[in-house]
Amino acid sequence: MLNRARTAALVALGVYAVVAVVYFITLAPSVPFWDAGEFIACSYILGIPHPPGTPLYVLIGRVATLIPWHTVPERINALSAVFSAITAALTYLVGLKLIRLAFGEKRDALQEWTAHIGALTGALLLAFSDTFWENAIEAEHVHPLGMSFAQILLLWLGLRWWEEHERRPTAGPLLLCVYVMWVCVGIHLGAGMMALPLIVLVAIVDRRAAALFAMPFVTMLVVPKGLQVMAGAVILLSTALFLYYTLQGKINRWVMVASAVGAAIGVKAAFYDETFTAHSALVAFASVVIPMTMLARRSREGRILALAFFLMAVGYSTHAYLPIRAAQHPAINEGDPSTWARLNALLERQQYGQMHFFPRRASWGVQLHKEFWRYFRRQWPLFPSGGIDAWGARMAAGGNWLLARVAAIPWAALLPLLLGLAGAVWQARRNRTAFLYVGSFLAISTAGLILFLNFSDHEVRDRDYFFASGYHAYCLWIGLGVAWLIEETRRLSVQRAVPVVVAVALLSQPLWLARTLWFTHDRRGNYVAHDYAYDMLAPLAPNSYVFTNGDNDTFPLWYMQEVENFRQDVRVVNLSLLNTDWYIQQLRDDPPRVPIHLDDDAIRMLGQGEVPDASGHYILTNEYMVKHIIESSEQGTRNWVKQPYFAVTVPEHMGFQPRFTLEGLVYRVNRDTLQGDLDEKVTRHALYDVFKYRGLFLADGSWDPGVYKDENAATLSRNFAAAHLQLAYYYRRQGKLDRGIAEMERVARMFPDFTDVLIPLGGFYMDHGDTAKALALFEKLTVNAPNDPEAFYSYGLTLAFKGDIEKALKQFDRAIELEPNYSQAFYGAYYCLNQSGQHDRAMGYIRHWVDGHPNDAQARALLESGRGVPRRPSSSQAPPRPPQPNLP
C-alpha cells in the first residue's frame, strides 16, 4: 500500500512538473484582453472588480504581485499556471481512485499499471485541452482557481471521505469540503456546483451524514441569489434539522418553539422584505445559534453542525473585504459596495439584470449546439481539422447535405469522445456510486448550466469557459475509457504485446493534442492588448476623457493606468457602466473628475436606467449622460474644460458623429463641424511614430504570423487598418494619389487576406492608370477568397475596362452563383454587354434580376426602355469601414 501511494505521489508530481513547464513556456507575457486586465489592475491596487467582486482572488493576486519575479501581469498570469498544473495533478489522483474503484480490491499488478495509464491520460488530456490550457496561461479567476482547482479538490475530498467512512465513520473531509466551498465563493461560484455531487455521494453512503451536511451544501446552491436568500435557506434548513433533533429529545421543546418563532421572522425578512433590518437579522441569527449551541453541548452531531456553520461563516467572511475596501474609494470600485444595499446588489449581480430559466433567450437547438456542443467538440482535437471543415463547407454550399453531415462529425476529437462514453458505461457497470458521483458533477456543469445560464443566440464572446467543469468531468471518464480499452485488449488478445501497444498509443493522445493546439495557445510575444491600450491612450490631450464601450477597450486601459501609471490624467468613461448611479457618482467625485453637474438625488433617479429627454422621449441613462458630460465640458469658455474623445470601438455616437475628427484609434469631439473628419498630422504621427504593434505587425508593417491572434484580437486590430484607409482617402481627396496608394499598400501588407482593404486598393490602382496591377491584385484575390462575390465582381469590372468582355462575364457569373442577390454583378454584366453592343444578352441579365427582384425600380425601368446605364461603383466612394468588434 505504501509503495502504491508513493508511486501515485511521484506520478502526480511528474504531471505537475510537465504541465507547469508547458504553461510557463506559453504564459502570456503581459495583459490579455477580456477580464484579465481588470483582475490584474484590481490585484495590484486592491480594487473591486465587476460583480460579484471576487474578493479572495484579489487578495491572492495582491500577494502574487509582491513576489519579485518578472512583471506584475506575469506574476498574476502565473497564478493561473500554477493552480492549473496542481489541478492536473489532482485530476490524475482522482482518476486513479476512480479506476481502482472500477477494478475493485482484487486487482492485479497489470490492472494497477493500467489504472495509472488511464488516470495519466485523462489528466494530460485535461491539461492540454482547448479551454483549460487557454485559461491556464492568463489571469483568469473563473477557471484555474475558482472552478477547476476547487472542484477537483472537493471531488478528491469526497472520495477520501467515502474511503475513510467505510473503515470508520468520520466527518473531517466533509467539514473541509464545507470550508473549501465557502471560501472559494470569494473567487467564483463554480466551487459551489460541487455541492450537488457531494450531496449525492453522502446521501448514498450515509443518509444521516447527508441530513447533517444538508444546510451548508444546499445553501451553497442559492448563493447567486444574494445574502438574504442565503440567510433564509440557512434558517429553513437549520430549523428542519432542529425539529428532527427536538423529536429525539436533544433540544428543549420550548427552545424549539422560540427558535421557530424567530425563524419565521427571519424567513419573512429574508424572502419578503427588501432589506434586513438590524432587529430581524438579530432574531434570525439567534433562531439558528441558540438551538445549535444547545445541540452542540449534548451530541456529536450538534458539534459537527456547529463547526460546519462556523466554517461556512469563516469561508464567506472574505466578502467583508468588499465594503471595507469600497469605503476607501479605490480607483477601480465596481458597484461601490460601501453600503448594505449596494453590497447586496453586487452579490446578487443586479447590474446584469434578472436571470430566468424561462422564457428561453434562444432556441434549445441554438443553446445545445452553438453554445455547448460547438465548444465541447473542440476540446480534444488530436490533429488539425481545418481541411475537413473546409470540405464540409463546400459540400454544404453545393447542397450535398449528407457529406456535409459526415464532415460535421468531430473526427479530430472522435477518439477521446468515444473513450469518454466507454468510460462512463464501464464505470456505471462496475461502481454505481462512483458513476452517480461523477455523473452528477458532469450533469450540473453541462445540462444544469445550459438551463441556468440561458444563453442568447448573440453572446458577445465564446462562452466555452462556463462549461470547463463539464470538460473536466468528461476527462475523468476518458481516463476510465482508456483503462477499460487496455483491459479489454488484454483480455481478448493472445499476444502480450498488443495491450502494451494499445496503452502506448492511448497514452500518446495528450502529445498529439498538445502538438495540435500549441500555436493557438502559445502567448509568447503577444502584447496585442497591452499595445492596443497604449495606442489608444498615448495621443490623447492632457486631462481629457475618452468614452469606451466594453471590456476590451476598457480593462486594458485600466491596467495601463493603474499598474503602469500611464496617462493617469485621462479618465476612461465606460458607456456600459454609465447606466449606473454609483459609476456616475465616481466620475463626478473621484479624480480625474469628469464635468458632471448633478446632485446625488438626480443621479439616483438616473440609476433607474432610462430618463426623459428635452422632447419627453425616454432615452437610456448613458445617452443622457454622454450629452450632459460633453455639454458640461464646453460651458463658460471658448475651449473645452476637458477634451472629450470616443474610442473607435464605440458603435453608438449619440448624435456627435458630425463633430468627430479621427485621431488614430479615437475620435476627437470638436465644438463644431468645421474641423473635418480626419486630422492628418495627428493620425499619421500616431500611426508611424507613437503606436506600438508588438505581436501584430513586423518591423516592415506586415502581419506577424509567428504570434497567434484570436478572432477578437484580429478584429480589434483592423481599427489600425481603418485609420490607414481614412488617411488614404484623405490623400486621394487632396490629389495625392501616390501617398494614398502607399497607405493602401501598407494596409494590404498588414492584412493580406482582408478583402475590404484589397478591393479599394485595386480601385486606387485603376484611378492611377495601373490596370495591370489592379488585374493582378483581383486575380489573386479570387484565388485567395474563392467564396467572396465582391472579389469576382471587382475582377470582372477591371477585365471589362480592359476590354476582355467574355472573361469579365465569367467573373460576373461566378459572383452571381455565389450570391444570387448581389445586384452589382447583374448590373456589371449588363453594363459590359450594353457598352459592347450586345443589347439582347445585356437585357437577359436584367430580366434574370427582375424575375427574382420585381420591386427594383431601376431594373424595371431598364427593362421597359431597353436601354440605360446602371449605377457603377467608384473608388471615390467613402472607404468601407472594417467590421467592428462585438463588445459587451
Predicted feature locations:
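Loop-to-helix entry region of an early transmembrane alpha helix in multi-pass inner-membrane enzymes
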Residues: 55, 59, 67-89, 93-94, ...
